[in-house]
Amino acid sequence: MSQGKIVQIIGAVVDVEFPRDMIPRVYDALKLDENGLTLEVQQLLGDGVVRTIAMGSSDGLKRGMTVSNTGAPITVPVGKGTLGRIVDVLGTPVDEAGPIDTDKSRAIHQAAPKFDELSSTTELLETGIKVIDLLCPFAKGGKVGLFGGAGVGKTVNMMELINNIAKAHSGLSVFAGVGERTREGNDFYHEMKDSNVLDKVAMVYGQMNEPPGNRLRVALTGLTMAEYFRDEKDENGKGRDVLFFVDNIYRYTLAGTEVSALLGRMPSAVGYQPTLAEEMGCLQERITSTQTGSITSIQAVYVPADDLTDPSPATTFAHLDATVVLSRDIASLGIYPAVDPLDSTSRQLDPMVLGQEHYDVARGVQSTLQKYKELRDIIAILGMDELSDEDKLTVMRARKIQRFLSQPFHVAEVFTGSPGKYVALRDTIAGFKAILNGEYDYLPEQAFYMVGSIEEAVEKAKTLN
């Protein structure tokens, strides 16, 4: 095992000199002899010097300190022992519950599955959230992005999806907290503990206060654990269906930008790293379903300044099967979840996958809302009275649909005081179909706000009169 000496320290970037015949490879993990700090090799500068990123605080480091090459990339514990535990980017437990009970470990840098190992599926994943199930349905083994600016509800939507899917889903889940608030990580842990599903979830945290190296690699640590669960075969030779939650994929990009600047690379558009597309591809191509098992991934994506054309969210779009776009305009109307029904998309929105009835209702809802959007300018200038009877009917139904797309969440019960609702897909389709057909034209639009099924709207209308 070769040893080197630190020759330069600039923030999280540490240069180490090794003997010329024992230079480590890119992505090898180096360990500082004094305090065990891990450094990951990023560049070979020549003359035996390698440039590394510290996976922890570089406070107190000085030139001349001895560093040992481990000869392998960062490896993390995997398997059943990680369930119910919180680990950091290096797989070290941070929940004060003792060492992790597993003898298996895996390197965080792995190749994506080969083309002939991949498997495609059209099976739907019911979430119990009306607007998602109807307009941007999720595929089992697919990739979903929750796009939104600051404070429109990405994390709350993510928590509700975890609540509805992870609890009903008998498989295992991995949650990677990438550069998010420590408080949210704490809330998530207690949410899982209170609902007795902690033994089915592995948690990997690299939060906002961590150095950029940790935030850049923590998503790979979580993914490595999820891949192991997917590929581990049971006695019948089958793998598992795993859920992989990432909050937030933008912070992964941001950490890459910080590391890139520290390494002295020339920035590209808007100051992002020149390797943005490649880094995103390396992560996203590994999140996939094979013939052994599947990974269904749900990723929160922060949109800087609500600009969806920003390079970071724009690069993420290309990899996803469904996009759930959260809108500040809809949130300002008090409609939660603030999903934009006209901007959100899904590859599953196809009559061959969903069936003709679901497809027709979804398209009917979208066309009614689109017509209302076009009429709003006329209403603002001339008022409702100038519209034709047909347009008045469209506006009335669209406003009911808009309110019926809202729903009380289980995870928000503490704040709203109204109990959360899980709405089955067949009830969602039946409710919206009835509104489109005019069966509930006689009900006031307030009756449709923050209810679950259409029957609840009818009951609510009785209390309004």
Swiss-Prot record:
Reactions mediated catalytically: ATP + H2O + 4 H(+)(in) = ADP + phosphate + 5 H(+)(out)
Record keywords, A-Z: ATP synthesis, ATP-binding, Cell inner membrane, Cell membrane, CF(1), Hydrogen ion transport, Ion transport, Membrane, Nucleotide-binding, Translocase, Transport
A GO molecular function held by the record: ATP binding
InterPro entries cross-referenced by the UniProt entry: AAA+_ATPase, ATP-synt_VA_C, ATP_synth_F1_bsu, ATPase_a/bsu_AS, ATPase_alpha/beta_chains, ATPase_F1/V1/A1_a/bsu_N, ATPase_F1/V1/A1_a/bsu_N_sf, ATPase_F1/V1/A1_a/bsu_nucl-bd
Subcellular location: Cell inner membrane
Signal peptide residue numbers: none
EC number: 7.1.2.2
Function description: Produces ATP from ADP in the presence of a proton gradient across the membrane. The catalytic sites are hosted primarily by the beta subunits.
The protein's assembly and partners: F-type ATPases have 2 components, CF(1) - the catalytic core - and CF(0) - the membrane proton channel. CF(1) has five subunits: alpha(3), beta(3), gamma(1), delta(1), epsilon(1). CF(0) has three main subunits: a(1), b(2) and c(9-12). The alpha and beta chains form an alternating ring which encloses part of the gamma chain. CF(1) is attached to CF(0) by a central stalk formed by the gamma and epsilon chains, while a peripheral stalk is formed by the delta and b chains.
NCBIfam families (alphabetical): atpD
Name of the protein in its database record: ATP synthase subunit beta
Taxonomic source organism: Neisseria meningitidis serogroup A / serotype 4A (strain DSM 15465 / Z2491)
